[in-house]
Amino acid sequence: MANSVFWAIAVALVLGAEAYMPLDYRCGVKPKSRDNCGPPGISPDECVKKGCCFDDSDPDSIWCYTPWKFEDTICNPAEPKARVNCGYPGITSQDCDKKGCCFNDTIPNVVWCYQPIIEAVERDCSAVEPKKRVNCGPPGVSPDECIKNGCCFNSDVGGVPWCFKPEIKKELLQCAVLPKARINCGYPDITMDQCYKKGCCYDSSESDSIWCFYPDIEDVTIIE
């Protein structure tokens, strides 16, 4: 969630309130779901240079962690009432598409230009039991070399590979999260831009709800 990460932003206007979703929220990983991407004490700059995300707002979580890897965007017109607006009144399909959003005007009385679901791939190191680790590097491989090759590194357990293959999960992420189900990703008075830089979703259409929140994992499929 560092400032040097570039973002593609999808902008929407809902009844005069701000409601936005960053299409590239690769660092929007919930604290409890993070996989370590650097050694203890790594600086924000060093973390980002490694292609990782850095966020130290939660003292009990991993600060330098592996980002989401995006595969595709998905438009799902099967749930029209759950659509999250991504345009303005009268927006054309061409302008909607340029924003990285979905357009479907076949159903009346619902949003036509709406935010897509993001298909991402997650490398989950914590899901691999030590006895089930599959070696992913040569003897003596360094933590940096191991991680750079897309593998996991953990030297806490003896007699098992320290550099090993992660569990690969395909997940669907979205910002269409009900207010009561949102997990806070910000702090009081956080701005829209500050929220985006943290890789999170922003929706200020309801004054008494969390405005800056983590994208929701809709579906998980283990592919490797």
Swiss-Prot record:
Q: Where is the signal peptide?
A: 1-17
Domain P-type, by residue range, is 25-68, 73-117, 123-167, 173-216
Chief localisation class: secreted
A GO CC annotation recorded here is: extracellular space
| GO terms, biological process | maintenance of gastrointestinal epithelium
Attached carbohydrates are found at: 104
Give the Gene Ontology MF terms in alphabetical order.
Answer: growth factor activity
Task: Check the record and name the SUPFAM superfamilies matching this protein.
Answer: Trefoil (SSF57492)
Disulfide pairs here are: 27-53, 37-52, 47-64, 75-102, 86-101, 96-113, 125-152, 136-151, 146-163, 175-201, 185-200, 195-212
Signal is among the record's keywords? yes
Q: Which InterPro entries match?
A: P_trefoil_chordata (IPR017994), P_trefoil_CS (IPR017957), P_trefoil_dom (IPR000519), P_trefoil_dom_sf (IPR044913)
Q: In which tissues does this protein get expressed? A: Stomach mucosa.
Which segments of the protein form a coiled coil according to its record?
none
Q: Write out the annotated subcellular location.
A: Secreted
Q: Which UniProt keywords apply?
A: Disulfide bond, Glycoprotein, Growth factor, Repeat, Secreted, Signal
Task: Reproduce the UniProt comment on modification after translation.
Answer: Glycosylated.
UniProt function note: May act as a growth factor.
Protein name, entry field:
Putative gastrointestinal growth factor xP4
Classification of source organism: Eukaryota, Metazoa, Chordata, Craniata, Vertebrata
Gene that produces this protein: p4
